[in-house]
């Protein structure tokens, strides 16, 4: 009520996050869509959008894609290439994995052409602790953006929205990232790589989202926030 009807907020997007242990899921896909539909019905207009969270590589994940297209009718898709955002996952994956992901893109594009969910996939990238090379050993590479260019080139009808703009710091002051920025002459780990993709690879379907990273730095380090 306060967020949508007593504030200047005009639109919101309800999302979720997957975990290797399903009991940890923040919201399940049916809950996301039910909440979206309730808010929009109450408002009498579209005030909330909703994701379907997909889990590439896990059993039955493409069945959930089919169910979402036919039943849930989300506004777009959400996933985590690192698999599990809080601990090393058994199910990391890459956007440019032709065998795993390209059949999904094909379904997503076809559904969008037929009036279904937008051909937009929102991907969690970045947001790892300072010791990520050890605490996420073997999987941290999946939180970087080196898998974005080929997927974007091969699927121009898909929109790739990279959440957090792949900024590395998570639940910490961005001082370390700022120092790296100054010492490198203007490079922000992974976020700069993302920003370079459209011009470097000639694509127009890659976007950076800044919600959490803005919140993490706007007050604590406004100079870094402005540059990022």
What are these regions (language model features)?
Residues 8, 72-73, 156, 202:
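Short loop/turn motifs at secondary-structure junctions
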Residues 91-228:
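Catalytic pocket-lining loop regions of alpha/beta-barrel enzymes
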Residues 3, 12-14, 35, 196-199, ...:
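Generic low-polarity alpha-helical segments
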